[in-house]
A protein has these predicted regions:
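Conserved beta-strand-loop-alpha-helix junction that forms the acyl-donor binding cleft
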Residues: 113-123
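Conserved active-site tyrosine of GNAT-family acetyltransferases
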Residues: 126
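GNAT-family acyltransferases
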Residues: 1-90, 103-105, 110, 117, ...
């Protein structure tokens, strides 16, 4: 896969992926498949300055998106990730997370993942890469997982 900064002109291609309701069924915002709702999501992604369009290198078509958000001195959140259903069960998410985490750890000590409490699919994926559930974090409909730079290097997923 290839990840590059998201651009305004990517809206139509990314919405073609995002308009599948099943992508959003476990996300806190179940209605992101609707164009108006996705347009707001896309606008926030652009405003974040850390959003990426994820492309399949073979087809050169968009297959998803993710972004860096909420930078602090030690930590960066990686989130708002979604992929076309045809990518589920393959290595796309793992590859993307590896790229993003490796990049983040050039500048920060910890990667944070905030996931909807009922999003079993995303929680399982993050646990597979070695992120640990933060039992001290507030439970506000979301759970927080953290991955330390030292653990990432040791795990080498």
């Amino acid at each position: 896969l290839r990840a590059r900064p998201l651009k305004n002109e990517d809206f139509d291609e990314l919405f073609a992926v995002a308009r599948d309701p099943l992508i959003w069924e476990q996300h806190p915002s179940h209605d992101r498949y609707q164009e108006k709702v996705f347009r707001d999501f896309f606008r926030a992604a652009m405003e974040s300055g850390g959003a990426f369009l994820v492309l399949d290198v073979k087809t050169r078509y968009a297959i998803g998106s993710s972004r860096f958000v909420n930078l602090t001195a030690d930590e960066v959140e990686i989130g708002y990730t979604f992929f076309a259903r045809r990518c589920w069960g393959h290595t796309y998410n793992k590859e993307l997370k590896h790229l993003m985490i490796a990049h983040a750890f050039r500048f920060r000590e910890t990667a944070l993942f905030v996931i909807g409490e009922d999003n079993g699919r995303s929680r399982a994926a993050i646990e597979k890469i070695g992120a640990a559930l933060d039992p001290e974090a507030p439970r506000d409909g979301a759970v927080r997982y953290r991955l330390a730079k030292a653990a990432f290097g040791a795990k080498g997923f």
